Amino acid sequence: MRRNRSNIEFSSRLPKKSFLCPAKVIELEKIKVGAVSYLNTKPLLYGMQNEQFLQTHELVLDYPAHIGEALKQGIVDVGLVPAALLPSFEQSFIVSDYGIAADFDVASVCLFSEVPLEKIETIYLDYQSRSSAALLKILMREFWGIQPALVETKDEGFRTKITGTAAALVIGDRAFEQRRLSTYVYDLAAEWRGFTGLPFVFAVWVSLKPMSPEWIEQFNAANAAGMDYLEEIAEAQKYSAFNLRTYFQHHIAYRLTEERLKGLERFLELLKVY
């Protein structure tokens, strides 16, 4: 059994005998799957938005921080959870070989400002993010050596405050729009890679109880289904703010390889410090 220090089990790699879920949960109730409502999840959800999958599953879409809370409260059974939330669960299981990661620049998780890093005095934190905010704090203190004031936000108005020495962390699809407006753009995944030499994992599929090996196999297949249709999925979005074909194929990494899991483990280690 593979386990890290935060009581997180990598279920898709455990022996089959370790997955003993009550049959009634699988057979009598739909499994509620919470996913992020950003463009980068479209390829993962491609294989879940069909009649066969939806006969036994219900999809719940929201932004990252809400999905984590929904999992804690039992509103969903499985969630695409921000990596920074993993230590907050008493016990959790990573139940898929797929997630949201970046090997180099991610393009959609950036610090935007009108001045260079060393001149930033205030940073407004995107209210939709947990992992990205945690990553920003690690970069600030461990690598950049800056200590601006950090301000929590509650609505979309925070982006209007990017002026003078005030910057903002913006994630998701809105980051593509902000890239056209701001003078300085610091890609957090690229910065992480530059300092650690590792990919960064933003989100993983998590459950709070073991899932059966049969379900995990089915769920992995659903995640994998869209990987052969990235161009078609990109074109179907009719999105003009960023080249989604490039985004899906070169910026976002969906498979949780060993190297990407090493990046996740390194991030979780630093979370304990910061």
What are these regions (language model features)?
Residues R2-R3, K16-Y274:
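Domain-level signature for soluble enzymes in the chorismate/prephenate branch of the shikimate pathway
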Residues F10:
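Cationic, low-complexity basic patches in intrinsically disordered or flexible, solvent-exposed regions
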